[in-house]
Regions:
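Divalent metal-coordination and catalytic microenvironments
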Residues: 36, 52, 62, 77, ...
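Active-site metal-binding motif and surrounding structural segment of the metallo-beta-lactamase
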Residues: 30, 55-59, 67-112
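Bacterial N-terminal signal peptides that target proteins for export
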Residues: 1-12, 19-20
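Accessory terminal helices/loops
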Residues: 15-18, 24, 224-225, 237-302
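Conserved beta-strand hairpin/beta-sheet module of binuclear metal-dependent hydrolase folds
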Residues: 30-75, 182-196
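Metallo-beta-lactamase
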Residues: 25-27, 31-33, 57-59, 63-67, 118-252, ...
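Solvent-exposed, acidic/flexible segments
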Residues: 45, 63-70, 94-97, 113, ...
Length: 302
């Protein structure tokens, strides 16, 4: 009976804290997307961080573009409830999603797809960190105590994590952006986190191993989940239209590049001549050429 009473009390405290927070102002860059779930990005199109409250503690999806963002999220956590960060799940290993791990771990356990640790260690460079710290006194202060925190757990292909009342399903996204991309699906909440496979009005950075056909397969998989809420790696959360628009873009890009290859155009000619309608206001235009290169690889196999 005592155990039952304690459990009920804990659950009541959790929901009371969650309800109370709905009236609080976490800051101008936080958006509530579901009960107990908040998305943060300091600047539009920078990496998102998501706070997921559970009865057993906080789950974070990524840790922020910079440690300054991570500390803002930590301040929000203190307003939300006196809960510890239980898990940090990374959608990718790049620094704009992982550099703030040291702010939350310990106690947070970091989870990512296999290959993330190797990628993070390879990219970790003291000179790069010093350059980032030199941006401003505030940024230098935010980096105090910095150390590289790599995943404690690496999964392969698929993993299911049950935390309190919430279930999180992790799926590997192959060749979509980094060496270790993860889509995260919350079936009860009908939310999907797309990693940087999908962004909003923003050209992706397509490294030489990125495959647009594989990216389209990942988008198809995520659409098949029938999500109500889509949280991209970069950009505002929204509906399944986010997936539809990115799918449309990649299909159009592949089709146009394929037609130009068939007409005898070289890669350089395609990059100079091809314009995709509807992308005029997209950010990251310097990345458009590598989008064309990825489409060219997808069409020709070269």
């Amino acid at each position: 009976m005592k155990v039952k009473f304690r459990l009920v009390a804990a659950v009541c405290f959790y929901f009371a804290a969650t309800c109370a927070v709905q009236a609080q102002d976490l800051g101008p860059h936080f958006k509530k997307v579901k009960d107990g779930i908040y998305v943060y990005a300091g600047v539009l199109n920078e990496a998102n961080v998501t706070i997921i409250q559970t009865q057993e503690g906080i789950v974070l999806i990524d840790t922020g573009q910079t440690p300054k963002d991570s500390h803002i999220v930590m301040a929000a956590l203190k307003k939300l409830a006196s809960q510890l960060v239980r898990f940090i799940i990374h959608t990718e290993p790049h620094a704009d999603h992982t550099v703030g791990n040291f702010v939350f771990s310990p106690p947070g356990i970091v989870i990512a797809h296999e290959g993330a640790t190797a990628s993070m260690k390879k990219a970790d460079n003291p000179a790069t960190i010093e350059k980032r710290m030199a941006v401003s006194p505030e940024m230098r202060d935010a980096y105090k105590g910095y150390r590289l925190v790599t995943p404690h757990v690496e999964y392969r292909d698929k993993m299911t994590l049950n935390v309190g009342e919430r279930t999180l399903e992790l799926y590997y996204l192959k060749n979509v952006h980094s060496e270790a991309d993860t889509a995260i699906w919350l079936p009860k909440e009908r939310m999907v986190f797309t990693a940087a496979a999908v962004t909003v009005k923003r050209f992706g950075n397509h490294r030489p191993f990125v495959s647009i056909p594989d990216t389209l397969s990942g988008i198809k998989m995520m659409k098949a989940l029938n999500p109500e809420v889509v949280v991209p790696g970069h950009g505002d959360p929204g509906s399944v239209k986010i997936l539809d628009e990115m799918e449309k873009y990649y299909n159009l890009l592949l089709g146009r590049v394929g037609a130009m290859v068939k007409a005898g155009k070289s890669l350089d000619e395609i990059k100079n001549e091809l314009k995709i309608p509807g992308t005029e206001d997209w950010a990251g235009k310097d990345r458009y050429p590598n989008n064309v290169e990825a489409a060219y690889r997808g069409v020709t196999g070269k």
